[in-house]
């Protein structure tokens, strides 16, 4: 018991605990009198000059409100002291239930809360993970350059039957049992054959058609089609082909390199730039894949219980991220804010994120890891490189403690993962570039 309050702790199972705190009647009266005098010194009351009304008058007008304020202040101070006394690591916001506060009587309240788990880290020694190595061949590079040529192709109208890789302009109307369905029709619709933008059978059915020709296609929607009204249903699409356009690819020469921003070095410099970009893309993905494998091992070796309050807070965060993404995609921020999202689909991801956060914090603490200034600078420069004035952005980050701390957290996480990597056995596995691209697209 402290001088002005008494507290008792009760373990409810798992990470849940309960504090019962009773503030003495003397402390209630002392706090009330102090607050009353403070209010009386500044209160503006009709017929009295500011601060000149007697405490009795102020009490008559504001006594109940003052008592409620005193209750809040006593909870704040006594709860902080009780947490220190019992050496509690409270996770999330506590749930406080208080009795009515009365002058001359002890003030009791109950606090239900969760604590952080006690973590004893298990080393990852003896565990093995695979590190994927990707070799980019000259053939891979040639294919990428060919894809770039297609991106910069000029489309010319041709008078012949449509074939794969052509761009076509069509009118179409879809029907179910002879009746048009919602979003099943379009006019002057542009489509590249072979893009797999449409359901199976649609693009293939247009191949061989001539400009001006009409055709009916019998197509069944996939059973897993997103719209339940259409999934698994047999439809008829009446299609009229308006135009066929074929790609005219640019020549792979110095002029083409200039179009892609290569001012010196011509075609050879372009090949090197494209190779570098390909390497960066697969390296970033494979590093992230390796990192996730390490973190999965960390969770497997260190099963911990996590506070439900932190999981719920993380679900809130993930849902907010979803709403922001929808707002960016739809350009309708007000509608996105009002979106009602179910919580259960986010629970597994939220639980994993909370576990990783707690475990990585323990890795940082146990190994006394500090954010490496050079790595921090490199991260800031990486972010700044995408802006028009990188130096200005770098200066802004270093003058903004909150933004810099966010990047510092990323650097600490990378260093923690590097520490975990040093404990593991790593086996290298080589895969072709095309396989790496498939993994990236999954």
From Swiss-Prot:
Isomerase as UniProt keyword: yes
Keywords: Cell cycle, Cell division, Chaperone, Cytoplasm, Isomerase, Rotamase
GO cellular component, one term: cytoplasm
A family per Pfam: FKBP_C
Keyword Cell cycle recorded: yes
SUPFAM superfamilies: FKBP-like, Triger factor/SurA peptide-binding domain-like, Trigger factor ribosome-binding domain
Cystine residue pairs: none
InterPro entries: PPIase_dom_sf, PPIase_FKBP_dom, Trig_fac, Trigger_fac_C, Trigger_fac_C_sf, Trigger_fac_ribosome-bd_bac, Trigger_fac_ribosome-bd_sf, Trigger_fact/SurA_dom_sf
Group of enzyme by EC: isomerase
Protein's cellular compartments: Cytoplasm
One of the GO BP terms on file: cell division
A molecular function (GO) term: peptidyl-prolyl cis-trans isomerase activity
Enzyme nomenclature, EC number: 5.2.1.8
Highest taxon of the lineage: Bacteria
Catalyzed reactions per annotation: [protein]-peptidylproline (omega=180) = [protein]-peptidylproline (omega=0)
Role played: Involved in protein export. Acts as a chaperone by maintaining the newly synthesized protein in an open conformation. Functions as a peptidyl-prolyl cis-trans isomerase.
Family, similarity comment: Belongs to the FKBP-type PPIase family. Tig subfamily.
Record's comment describing the protein's domains: Consists of 3 domains; the N-terminus binds the ribosome, the middle domain has PPIase activity, while the C-terminus has intrinsic chaperone activity on its own.
HAMAP family tied to this protein: Trigger_factor_Tig (MF_00303)
Name of the featured protein: Trigger factor
Lineage: Bacteria, Pseudomonadati, Pseudomonadota, Gammaproteobacteria, Legionellales
């Amino acid at each position: 018991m402290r001088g002005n309050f008494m507290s008792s702790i009760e373990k409810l199972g798992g990470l849940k605990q309960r504090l019962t705190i009773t503030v003495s009647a003397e402390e209630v009266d002392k706090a009330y009198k102090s607050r009353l005098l403070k209010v009386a010194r500044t209160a503006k009351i009709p017929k009295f000059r500011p601060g000149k009304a007697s405490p009795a008058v102020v009490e008559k007008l504001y006594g109940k409100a003052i008592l409620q304020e005193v209750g809040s202040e006593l909870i704040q101070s006594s709860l902080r002291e009780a947490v220190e006394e019992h050496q509690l690591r409270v996770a999330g916001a506590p749930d406080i239930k208080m009795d009515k506060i009365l002058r001359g009587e002890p003030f009791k309240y109950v606090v239900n809360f969760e604590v952080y788990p006690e973590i004893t880290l298990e080393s990852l020694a003896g565990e093995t993970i695979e590190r994927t190595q990707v070799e980019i061949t000259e053939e891979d590079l040639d294919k990428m350059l060919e894809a770039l040529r297609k991106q910069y192709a000029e489309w010319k109208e041709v008078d012949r039957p449509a074939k794969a890789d052509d761009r076509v302009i069509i009118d179409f109307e879809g029907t179910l049992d002879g009746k048009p369905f919602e979003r099943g029709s379009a006019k002057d619709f542009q489509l590249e054959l072979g893009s797999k933008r449409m359901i199976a059978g649609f693009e293939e059915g247009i191949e061989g058609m001539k400009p001006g020709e009409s055709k009916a296609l019998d197509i069944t929607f996939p059973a897993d089609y997103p719209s339940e009204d259409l999934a698994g249903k047999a439809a008829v699409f009446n299609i009229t082909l308006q135009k066929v356009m074929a790609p005219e690819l640019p020549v792979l020469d110095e002029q083409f390199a200039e179009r892609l921003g290569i001012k010196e070095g011509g075609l050879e410099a372009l090949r090197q730039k494209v190779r570098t970009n390909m390497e960066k893309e697969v390296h970033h993905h494979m590093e992230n894949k390796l990192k996730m494998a390490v973190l999965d091992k960390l969770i497997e070796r260190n099963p911990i219980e996590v506070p439900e309050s932190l999981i719920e807070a993380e679900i809130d965060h993930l849902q907010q991220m979803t709403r922001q993404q929808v707002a960016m995609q739809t350009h309708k921020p007000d509608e996105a804010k009002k979106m009602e999202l179910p919580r259960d689909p986010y629970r597994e991801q939220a639980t994993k994120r909370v576990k990783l956060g707690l475990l990585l914090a323990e890795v940082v603490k146990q190994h006394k890891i500090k954010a490496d200034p050079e790595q921090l600078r490199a991260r800031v420069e990486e972010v700044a490189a995408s802006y028009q004035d990188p130096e200005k952005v770098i200066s802004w980050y270093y003058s903004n403690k909150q933004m810099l701390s966010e990047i510092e957290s990323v650097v600490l996480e990378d260093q923690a993962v590097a520490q975990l990597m040093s404990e593991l056995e790593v086996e290298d596995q080589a895969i072709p570039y095309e396989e790496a691209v498939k993994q990236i697209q999954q």
